[in-house]
């Protein structure tokens, strides 16, 4: 399963021609693959902070793949692993979960819906659960796989956001993600540039102190077949629609380190 993902990454990295999804032959499972890994993470100055950013550790189970008409990415984070009373996460929600299933319109219709750099179209969803009073939202919209210079294939999705805590729709989000191997070693391991952008806009004044906000993660990781080690710089701007004011830190930079084991 992991080899399938690696093969796709290597294909993009070598700039080989990438064909649009074609399911006209009826075989919707020909592009199936799956992967899973555990990441031991350290976060430094993670935002938002009240009043300062958080420094803490957590374990992340991360997974994804493709099965027929469905494309999936997700993770489950478990915070404060040792239940340290001195941790910034002590007394707070223990788990955060994110699931992002997409349904391929190309596979559903059996037609090639590609155009220009757009390789495949999806109905995209995104579900985030952070506990009783934390971020709890569901998003739905239009998604795509797009070919861009150097990076290769990226995911690009536009959602409308439903806030489960408020029981109301609240703005929109545009998201993109990428994975680009760019340096290869003789033993088959490689270094990648990987990351994502999540940008919210059009949020209502009654629910958010800022109508816009988001984050960008830029990671440099070393990968082998079984392990990965990396550093990520995450930039925040009014994250979650929280405006930067006295006593609230929602704009700035956070730092992340990760040690990964792949299954």
Swiss-Prot record:
Keyword Signal appears in the UniProt entry: yes
Pfam family, one: Channel_Tsx
Keywords on record: Cell outer membrane, Membrane, Signal
InterPro entries, alphabetized: Channel_Tsx-like, Channel_Tsx-like_sf
Location in or out of the cell: Cell outer membrane
Family as reported in the entry's similarity comment: Belongs to the nucleoside-specific channel-forming outer membrane porin (Tsx) (TC 1.B.10) family.
Signal is among the record's keywords: yes
Role, per record: Serves as receptor for a broad-host-range vibriophage, KVP40.
Signal peptide range: 1-20
Cysteine pairs bridged by disulfides in the record: none
Protein name as annotated: Outer membrane protein OmpK
GO cellular component: cell outer membrane
Coiled coil region boundaries: none
């Amino acid at each position: 399963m992991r080899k399938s993902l690696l093969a796709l990454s290597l294909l993009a990295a070598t700039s080989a021609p990438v064909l649009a999804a074609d399911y006209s032959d009826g075989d919707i499972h020909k592009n199936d693959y799956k992967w899973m890994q555990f990441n031991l993470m350290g976060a430094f100055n993670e935002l938002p902070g009240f009043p300062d950013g958080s420094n803490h550790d957590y374990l992340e189970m991360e997974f994804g793949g493709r099965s027929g008409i469905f494309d999936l990415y997700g993770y489950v984070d478990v915070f404060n692993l040792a239940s340290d009373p001195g941790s910034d996460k002590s007394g707070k929600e223990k788990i955060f979960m994110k699931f992002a299933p997409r349904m391929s319109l190309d596979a559903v219709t059996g037609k090639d819906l590609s155009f220009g750099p757009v390789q495949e179209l999806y109905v995209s969803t995104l579900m985030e659960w952070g506990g009783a009073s934390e971020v709890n939202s569901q998003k739905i919209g239009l998604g795509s796989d797009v070919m861009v210079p150097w990076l290769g294939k990226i995911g690009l999705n536009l959602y409308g956001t439903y806030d489960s805590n408020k029981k109301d729709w609240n703005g929109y989000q545009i998201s993109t993600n990428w994975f680009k191997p760019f340096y290869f070693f003789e033993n088959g391991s490689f270094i990648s540039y990987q990351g994502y952008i999540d940008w919210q806009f059009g949020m209502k004044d009654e629910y958010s102190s800022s109508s816009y906000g988001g984050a960008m993660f830029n990671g440099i990781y070393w990968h082998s077949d079984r392990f990965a080690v990396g550093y990520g710089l995450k930039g925040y701007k009014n994250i979650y629609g929280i405006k930067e004011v006295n006593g609230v830190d929602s704009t700035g930079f956070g730092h992340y380190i990760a040690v990964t084991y792949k299954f």
